[in-house]
Amino acid sequence: MSQDQPIVLDPTYASFDAAARPADLGATHFIGIGGAGMSVLAEMLHAEGVSVDGSDRSHSAKTDRLETLGITVEFGQRAENVAQAETVVYSSAIKPDNPEIVAAHAAGKRIVHRSDILALLMNGKRAVTVAGAHGKTTTSSMLSHILVNAGADPSYAIGGFIQGPDGTTLDGGHAGKGDILVAEADESDGSFAKYHPTIAIITNCEADHLDHYGDEAHYRAAFVAHAGRATGHVIISIDDPDGLAVLEAMPADVKSHTVAYGTTARESLPDLGGAAYVWIASESETAGSGVEQLTLHLPAAVTAGEPVSQSVALKVPGVHNARNAAAAISAAVLLGVSPADAAKAAGTFLGAARRFQVRGTVKQVTVVDDYAHHPTEIAALLDAARRRYPDSTIRVIFQPHLFSRTKFFAHQFAESLAKADDVIITGIFPAREKQADFPDISPSTIVDAAAGLKDASAGTWIQPVEDMCLAAKMMAMRAHHGDVIFTVGAGDITDMDQVLLTALEAHRESCE
C-alpha cells in the first residue's frame, strides 16, 4: 500500500495466498480486539505462537479473557499502539481515519482485514465455513461440539461464546491439534469471497446486508460464488425460497457435490439438479418438554454407504434449530463421524451463548436472552418460545441493530414482534452507522409499522422506550407470575439482563 495514496480499506481484497502461514505475520496488532470475531482470531494466533496485542475502546469479558492469556490490550486507540507491529488487523467496523490505521499506513505496515487472518488459519486444514443470514453461530457451535465429542480436537472460530453446563460459557475460539477448522463465514461485507473451504455450509440466503450488496440479486450471487469455491461439499438449506434459488443458480459441477436439506419431503420438491437431499422429519417438541424430536434421513451421498434414518433429540428448541442440526450433523458425518455418534453429541448441545439463553428467574418470571436481530430470526425465536412456554405470557424488550436494517425491515419487524404479547422497543444500536445519516429512523419506526398492521398485532402491546434501563423497569412492572421476558438484539441489550432481574426483584409484588 503506497503511503502517498488515500487510505482505502477493502475487506474483499485477499492479502495472502494458500502457502501463507501464521508465522509469516510477525508481531500482529488487532484494532478493536474485543470484538466478537476479532478476539477469537487473536486468541487463535496467540495459540499458534504469534506475538499478538491489540486495542479497544473499553473493557469487556472478551478483553478480560485475552489479558488472562497474556495478550496485551490497550484501551483507547492511538498511533503509538501500532509502533511495534508488523501486521495490523482491522474489521469492517474500523474506518480509514482511525488513528491506528493512519499510523500503520504512514509507516508502511501490512494492513489486513480480519477475514485475511481467518483465511490464513484455514490454510492446510480441512476447513468448514458456515455462512448465511441466520444460524451461523449455532450451527458452527453445534458442529464444533460434535467434533470435540468425537475426539477430533478441531480448531474453531465462532463469533460468540458457547453455552456450557450449569450456566457456564465456553469461549468461541480454540486452536486444536486436529486437522479440522470450523468457522463462521461473515457474508455481511463480502469478505467470505476469500475462503476456499472443504465444506461450505449455507444456512439461509434470506436478504440482509443490502447496505453492502445493493439488492437481493447481488446478495444471492455472492452465495452462489461462495458455493463454487468449496473444494469438497456444499451443504445448503432450501426451506427458504432464496436458498432454493441459490441452489438452482449453481453450476452443474457444483450441484453434483451439494447436499441440500429441509423440512419438505423429497417427493414434494422440484428437481434439484443432481444435489443430494437430507429430509428433516420433525416430530416437534412436546409442549414444555424442552426436547425437540426429529429424524434426519441422510442419503448415501452423506453417509458414503447406505442411506440412514437417524433419530435426534435436541435440547435447543425450534424448527430453526432442527435445520441447524441437520447441517451440523451432515457436515460431521462427511468428516468421518458416524450418524449415531453425531446425533448423540448434538443431543447434549446446550446452544450458543445469547441463543435462547436463560439468564435467571425471579419469583417465577424467567428472563431469556437472544441475539435475534432480523425479522425471520425473531419470528423463529418467538415460535420456539411458544412451544417451550405454551402457557406463559411472552414479553420482549427488543433493541434494533443498525438504522439501515430498521429502515429496510420495519414492517417485517412489526409482523414478527406481533407474535409476542408485550413488546418494548429500545433505542437503536448503531454499530458502524450514524444516526445523522438516518434522521427519520427511530424505535417509533417499528411501532408505527405495527400500528398499520390489520390483524397481526391486534393483541400485542408495543411501545418505544429509548432508554434500556427504563425499558427494563417498565417491563418488570408489567410482569406477572409465570411470564417469560426475552431481551432480544445483537447490540448491548445483553448487558441489561441483570438490570432486569434486579428490577423484577424490586417489583416482585407484580410477579405474585
UniProtKB/Swiss-Prot annotation:
Location relative to the cell: Cytoplasm
Gene Ontology MF: a single term: ATP binding
Entry GO terms, CC: cytoplasm
Pathway(s) annotated for this protein in UniProt: Cell wall biogenesis; peptidoglycan biosynthesis
Residues reported to bind ATP: G132, A133, H134, G135, K136, T137, T138
Function: Cell wall formation.
HAMAP family: MurC
Record's protein name: UDP-N-acetylmuramate--L-alanine ligase
Taxonomic path: Bacteria, Bacillati, Actinomycetota, Actinomycetes, Bifidobacteriales
